[in-house]
Amino acid sequence: LYESERQQVLLGDDIDFMTDYMKLEKLCNPEFNFEVNILNEVRYIQVPPLLFMPVIEYVIRTTVCGENGKGENIRIDFQMEENQLRFICTYCLRKKESLQVAPAFDKLRQRLDLLYPGGYQLKSGYNDEALCTIGLMLEL
């Protein structure tokens, strides 16, 4: 949290913070499961602090367990391709009606507009099984 006062932090530090946050959630809800995948070497990329936390917080509030209460609730992928950082979060919705733009996403879009004017894409969607994906692509 001390690093949130800085303009930029290492993505690896932010990933560690998100992982700790989800581990804390798992202590409160033992059926909650998550997976974080880091493709390519993204840990040393500089990003604004806590940039991805609004997505994580929203997803934790809206997920359900896999079949029979077991399985992965959230999967997070970080990948660098050329000069584009990709953050993809996949999770199950409680119900399809839950897929609404959260107020936190409005604030996230405002922040992204200031930090990456015209240099980002924030998308979300779901399939028939209520599996939802939120993707954030940043031009670095």
Question: Where in the sequence are the language-model features?
Answer:
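C-terminal beta-strand of the catalytic ATP-binding
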Residues: 91, 135-140
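A short beta-turn/loop motif at secondary-structure boundaries
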Residues: 126-128
